From Swiss-Prot:
Residues 447-459, 512-524, 544-588, 611-636, 645-658 have a biased composition (Polar residues). Disruption phenotype: No visible phenotype under normal growth conditions. Signal peptide: none annotated. This is Probable transcriptional regulator SLK3. Coiled coil: none annotated. Pfam families: LIM_bind (PF01803). Residues 176-423 are annotated as: Dimerization. A motif (Nuclear localization signal) lies at residues 185-199. Probable transcription regulator that functions in the development of the carpel margin meristem similarly to SEUSS (SEU). In association with SEU, supports organ development from meristematic regions by facilitating auxin response and thus organ initiation, and by sustaining meristematic potential through the maintenance of PHABULOSA expression. Belongs to the adn1/SEU family. It is found in: Nucleus. It comes from Arabidopsis thaliana (Mouse-ear cress). The gene is SLK3. It comes from the Eukaryota. InterPro entries: LIM-bd/SEUSS (IPR029005).
C-alpha cells in the first residue's frame, strides 16, 4: 500500500487554482530525453565518444555477402554523417525541446534523404523492390491507423490514469482555506465529465440504519444496484455531475479537515471505445477530523473518458473504523481513575464503622460525572452509523430527490405549466407511452409465434399428404380437433397460427392453379375431372381446414353456411356411382360432422369479430368459404371426388375444377398486403 500524497515524481503546478492537464506527460507532449552523461561532458569528449560508438556500430557491407534476400539490410554509414546527425539532434533538443524549429527540422530532413539515397545505391535491384513494398505497406498501415483513431483520442500510455488520479488528489488537498464553491466548480469541471456519476455502495455493511437507503427505502432495491459487489440491496447513493461541487463543499464544511487515499497496485484497462478503467481491489479512504479520524476500506473503480476526465467513480465500502486521539481521551480516563481511587480510600478509612451515606453519595456523583465526561468525548455527534457526516448524507438524499424530479422540472419548464398541472400531464403521457409500448411488444410476440407456427404446420400438411388413406384420414380428424380447440379457446397464439396456415393454403392453391385453363371454369356440371390414382383422401380434410380457418365469418354468415351444409343439393353429376362405395366415405362423413360441430361452437362463442377486423378482404373470403363448402359436401351427396391440393402439384395441368376462380378472387384480396406476398415466410412454397 502506498499513500496517495506521495507524488514527488509528478510535475505538479504550484498554484492550486491552476487547473491544467499539462503536468501529465502524455505521449503527445513527451520529448526525447538526451543522455544525461552526454550533456555534462565537454564537446571534445562527446565527439570522441560518438566516434567510438560510430566505429563500433558501422559494419562494412558487400553485395556478395547476401545469401538471402529476407535478411536485414546492413548499411555502410560514414562516421561524419552519423556524427552530424547526432549533433543535429542534440541541437534540436537544446534549442527547441518541443521540436518546432523549422531550420533544424529541414537540416534533419536533408540528412535523412541523403542516407536513404546512399542506402538505395548500395542495394541490389531485388532488395530495392522489396524495400519499396515494405515502405508502401507501412504507409498503408499508418493511414489505416490514423483513420481508425479519432483526433480527440490521445494515444494510450500505461500509467496515465494513475497520474491523473494523483493530480486529482493533489488539488483536492491543496484547496483554499475559505472553502469557496467557485473553486470546487472549477475543480469538478477540470476532472469530471459532464456525464459523470459518483456512486457509494454500502451493501456489505451488516447493520445499517434506514438512512442508508435514501429517501425511497421501498423502491431503492429495484432502482439501485452495485456493479462491484453485484448485490441489489439498494443500500447506496448516487450523485451526478450537477451536485458534485456542492457535495464536496458540504463535505469539507462538515468538520473534515483532510481526505487521504491509500491505494494498492492498480489494474488498468483500455476499452476499444477509448474509455480507460482504473480499478483498485483494496483502497483505504481516511477522512481527518479535528478530534478523530475515520478509516474506510473498500473497492474502488474509476472510469476515464478518452480526454482523461472521470466518467464514473464507484466505491464499494466494506467496513470502517473510528479512531480517537489519545491526547483527548487520556485526561478523562485519568480523572475517572482518580475518582475510583478516592472511593477506594474512603472505604478503607471508614474501617468497621462503615461508609456514611453522605460519602457514598458524593463518591457516586464523582464517578458518574467522570464517566459522562468521558462518554461525551467519545461520542461523535457529527457522524452517523456509517462514519459519514450527517449533513453529507442528507445532501445525498436531497440530490436523489432532485434527480427523480428532474423530468418534471424540465416538463414544466418546456410547457409553461405549474407543478401540479405538469405532474398530472406527465403521468398521463407516461401511462400512454407505457401502454403503447406494451401493445407493440404484444404484437411482436404474436408475429413471432405466428411466423414460427406457419412453416411448421405447412411441413405437417405436406408430410400428411404422402401417407396412406386410412392413416391420413385419422390424422386429418385429429388435426381438425386441435384446430377446433384452438379456435374455441380464442388465444392470440392460436389465432395467429391459424391465420398463417390459411394464408399458406391460399398461396398453395394459387401456385397449383396459375397454369390452368380459365375458359373451363363454368361449373361442376360441365366437367368430368380425371382423378389421379395417387390422390390421398386427406385432400378433403385440407379443404375443410381452409374453411375452418378462412376469416371466421360473422354469425349470420355462419348460419348461411350451416344451411348450405345441411341442405345443399348435389352439384356434381353422378357419373361415377362407384365412388359412393369408397372405403373412405365413412371417414369423410366424420370429417363433415366435425366441421359442422366446429362451426356451431364458433357461432356460439362469437369469436369472429376480432378476425373480421384483422382481415380487410372479408367478403371475398366468405364467398369463397361458401363455394368451398358446396364443393366439399358434393363428395358425400353427389359422388365426385375432389382432387387433393398436395397431389395437384403433379397433375396441375389436368385440374379443371372451379377452385382456381375462387382462389383468384381470394388471392386478389390478400395481394394488397405485403405480408402475404413474402415468399420467405413460407419457405419458398
Amino acid at each position: 500500500m502506498q499513500r496517495s500524497s506521495g507524488i514527488n515524481n509528478l510535475h505538479i503546478p504550484t498554484s492550486p487554482m491552476s487547473f491544467s492537464s499539462n503536468g501529465i506527460n502524455l505521449p503527445g507532449s513527451m520529448v526525447l530525453d538526451g543522455s544525461p552523461s552526454m550533456q555534462h561532458l565537454p564537446q571534445q569528449q562527446q565527439r570522441q565518444l560518438l566516434e567510438q560508438q560510430a566505429g563500433q556500430g558501422s559494419v562494412p557491407m558487400r553485395e556478395n555477402s547476401y545469401s538471402h534476400v529476407d535478411k536485414k539490410l546492413r548499411l555502410e554509414v560514414k562516421q561524419e554523417d552519423l556524427l552530424q546527425q547526432q549533433i543535429l539532434q542534440q541541437l534540436i533538443q537544446r534549442q527547441d525541446p518541443t521540436g518546432r524549429n523549422p531550420q533544424m527540422q529541414a537540416l534533419l530532413q536533408q540528412q535523412r534523404v541523403r542516407q536513404h539515397q546512399q542506402m538505395l545505391q548500395s542495394m541490389s535491384p531485388s532488395q530495392r523492390l522489396q524495400l519499396q513494398k515494405q515502405q508502401q505497406l507501412r504507409q498503408q498501415l499508418q493511414q489505416q491507423g490514423t483513420q481508425q483513431i479519432s483526433p480527440n483520442v490521445r494515444p494510450y500510455e500505461v500509467g496515465v490514469c494513475a497520474r491523473k488520479l494523483m493530480m486529482y488528489l493533489y488539488h483536492l488537498q491543496q484547496r483554499p482555506a475559505e472553502n469557496c464553491i467557485t473553486y470546487w466548480r472549477k475543480f469538478v469541471a477540470e476532472y469530471f465529465s459532464p456525464r459523470a456519476k459518483q456512486r457509494l455502495c454500502l451493501s456489505q455493511y451488516e447493520s445499517v440504519g434506514h438512512h442508508a437507503l435514501g429517501m425511497f427505502p421501498q423502491a431503492a432495491p429495484d432502482m439501485w444496484q452495485c456493479d462491484l459487489c453485484g448485490t441489489k440491496s439498494g443500500k447506496g447513493f448516487e450523485a451526478t455531475f450537477d451536485v458534485l461541487a456542492r457535495l464536496i463543499e458540504i463535505k469539507f464544511a462538515s468538520g473534515i479537515i483532510d481526505e487521504l487515499l491509500y491505494l494498492d497496485h492498480p489494474r488498468e484497462n483500455r476499452f476499444p471505445n477509448g474509455l480507460m478503467m482504473l480499478e483498485y481491489r483494496k483502497a483505504v479512504q481516511e477522512t481527518v477530523h479535528e478530534q478523530f479520524r475515520v478509516v474506510r476500506e473498500g473497492h474502488l473503480r474509476i472510469i476515464f473518458s478518452p480526454d482523461l476526465k472521470i466518467l464514473s467513480w464507484e466505491f464499494c465500502a466494506r467496513r470502517h473504523e473510528e479512531l480517537l486521539l489519545r491526547r483527548l481521551i487520556a485526561p478523562q480516563v485519568n480523572q475517572l481513575l482518580q475518582v475510583a481511587q478516592k472511593c477506594q480510600s474512603t472505604i478503607s478509612e471508614s474501617g468497621s464503622q462503615g461508609v456514611s451515606q453522605q460519602d457514598i453519595q458524593s463518591n457516586s456523583n464523582m464517578v458518574l460525572g467522570a464517566g459522562r465526561q468521558l462518554a461525551k468525548f467519545m461520542e461523535l455527534q457529527s457522524l452517523n452509523d456509517l462514519g459519514y457526516p450527517k449533513r453529507y448524507i442528507r445532501t445525498l438524499q436531497i440530490s436523489e430527490v432532485v434527480k427523480s424530479m428532474k423530468d418534471l422540472m424540465n416538463f414544466t419548464g418546456e410547457h409553461k405549466v405549474g407543478p401540479l398541472e405538469g405532474l398530472k400531464q406527465l403521468l398521463e403521457q407516461t401511462a400512454t407511452v407505457k401502454l403503447q409500448r406494451q401493445k407493440m411488444q404484444e404484437m411482436e410476440q404474436f408475429g413471432n409465434s405466428g411466423a414460427m407456427s406457419g412453416p411448421a404446420q405447412a411441413q405437417m400438411t405436406l408430410s400428411s399428404g404422402t401417407m396412406s388413406g386410412s392413416t391420413a384420414n385419422n390424422n386429418s380428424n385429429n388435426h381438425h380437433q386441435i384446430v377446433g380447440r384452438g379456435a374455441m379457446n380464442g388465444s392470440p397464439q392460436a389465432t395467429a397460427a391459424l391465420t398463417n396456415y390459411q394464408s399458406m393454403l391460399i398461396r398453395q392453391n394459387a401456385m397449383n392453379n396459375q397454369n390452368s385453363n380459365t375458359g373451363n371454369q363454368e361449373g361442376f356440371s360441365s366437367q368430368n375431372p380425371t382423378l389421379n390414382s395417387n390422390q390421398s383422401p386427406s385432400s378433403s380434410s385440407q379443404q375443410r381446414e381452409n374453411l375452418a380457418t378462412s376469416g371466421f365469418p360473422s354469425s349470420p354468415q355462419m348460419q348461411q353456411q350451416q344451411h348450405i351444409l345441411n341442405g345443399t343439393p348435389n352439384m356434381l353429376p353422378q357419373n361415377h356411382p362407384h365412388q359412393l362405395q369408397s372405403p373412405h366415405s365413412h371417414g369423410n362423413t366424420q370429417e363433415q360432422q366435425m366441421l359442422h360441430q366446429l362451426l356451431q361452437e364458433m357461432t356460439e362463442n362469437g369469436a369472429s369479430v376480432e378476425q373480421q377486423q384483422a382481415f380487410p378482404g372479408q367478403s371475398g373470403s366468405n364467398n369463397n368459404t361458401e363455394r368451398n363448402t358446396t364443393a366439399s359436401t358434393s363428395n358425400i351427396s353427389g359422388g365426385g371426388r375432389v382432387p387433393s391440393r398436395i397431389n395437384s402439384f403433379k397433375a396441375s395441368s389436368n385440374n379443371n375444377l372451379p377452385f382456381s376462380e375462387d382462389i383468384s378472387v381470394t388471392d386478389h384480396d390478400f395481394s394488397e398486403d405485403g405480408f402475404f406476398n413474402n415468399s420467405d415466410i413460407y419457405g419458398g412454397l
